[in-house]
Amino acid sequence: KEILDINSDNEELCEIVNNFKEVISKCESLGMEVFPVSMDINLLKAIYPAYITISCAEATSNNANLTGIIFGSRSDKENINEMMMDARTNGFSELIKRRFILGSYILQKENQEKLYLNACRVRRMITSCMNEFFKEYDGLILPAAASVAPLFDADKDRLSDEYLILDNHLAIGNFGGYPSITIP
């Protein structure tokens, strides 16, 4: 319900809201019972930060073996530190490198409780909420995207509720391992 409510106040997104409502009407005309459900807005806002925290930490941990000695690309560097640095930097995009840096920070001993373990708690809260939905309903129908694709030079406030919820709610499936399908 909250995901659709955020969309409905924005004139630019009226077409998406109307298309989504048409899909709901079509489902109902096919005999499906459709009910709006609510999720705590704070949990919806926490999806993206929790997802980024956990995924960056896991990416860093899962790729820690890329030393250039046994795994990873081998280089002709002269010492082990240079070999490891080369194996962990060459061949990765800037985005992947940023994720590794963020993941390393998250996994540092002094940050694990505050960042990683709290993100895992948030993930459990979200999946617990979803599991409660699935005790009562067979599935959830959500908009697949918040808006049409933005222009390359469009500014986007990545800390706004709209961004944190509308562009990232599909990560819920990753948290709980729920099957999903996106239908155009």
What are these model-predicted stretches?
Residues 1-9:
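Short beta-strand segments enriched in small/hydrophobic residues
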Residues 8-18:
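Glycine- and acidic-residue-enriched helix-capping/strand-helix junction motifs
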Residues 44-50:
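N-terminal beta-loop-helix "entrance" segment that forms/cooperates
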Residues 40:
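Conserved phosphate-binding/catalytic loops in two-lobed NTP-binding clefts
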Residues 16-37, 46, 55-61, 65, ...:
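Glycine-rich, small-residue loops and helix-cap segments
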